[in-house]
């Protein structure tokens, strides 16, 4: 019987992430997540972005996309590059995370004529958390940018939550 269980429930690589949110009986609210990435090391590191820091987005042709200044301080967990925050929170209590979205999403085609408002998919969390304090601000802000994928990156989508428990998921179907 144990052999059958091992064959049926065998070990396999996982690339799924799970996001949860909980509200306690006292009304306090928390968001959490897992990161399961079987394709190799993500070179994860904690990052701190102070309010006022000047930032710029990558595009498929280099670091020549949207320029922005942090309105809010941010702490987060970056993967691969310091700019690619997978999960973070800002000083206003807004939290955001990116989640793998294979086979379901797609991005706008890259057009260098729009670099001044082009944002790399893996920098959306960094940008949202440095610019927005509420879900309503996030919804308005995403209408003003063009999100593009970087070469060799997976399509992702984003989960954003504020301290009141409001949440939104932004899919990458543009």
Listing of model-derived features with the role each one plays in the protein:
Residues 1-10:
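Bacterial N-terminal signal peptides
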């Amino acid at each position: 019987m144990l052999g059958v269980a091992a064959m049926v429930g065998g070990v396999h690589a996982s690339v799924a992430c799970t996001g949860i949110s909980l509200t306690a009986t006292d009304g306090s609210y928390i968001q959490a997540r897992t990161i399961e990435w079987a394709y190799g090391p993500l070179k994860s590191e904690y990052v701190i972005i102070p309010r006022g820091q000047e930032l710029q987005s990558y595009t498929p042709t280099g670091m020549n996309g949207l320029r922005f200044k942090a309105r809010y301080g941010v702490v987060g967990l970056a993967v691969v590059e310091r700019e690619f925050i997978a999960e973070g929170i800002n000083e206003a209590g807004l939290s955001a995370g990116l989640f793998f979205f294979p086979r379901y999403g797609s991005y706008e085609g890259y057009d260098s004529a729009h670099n001044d408002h082009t944002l790399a998919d893996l920098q959306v969390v960094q940008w949202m958390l440095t610019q927005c304090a509420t879900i309503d601000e996030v919804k308005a802000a995403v209408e003003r940018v063009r999100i593009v994928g970087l070469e060799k990156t997976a399509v992702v989508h984003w989960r954003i939550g504020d301290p009141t428990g409001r949440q939104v998921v932004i899919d990458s179907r543009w």
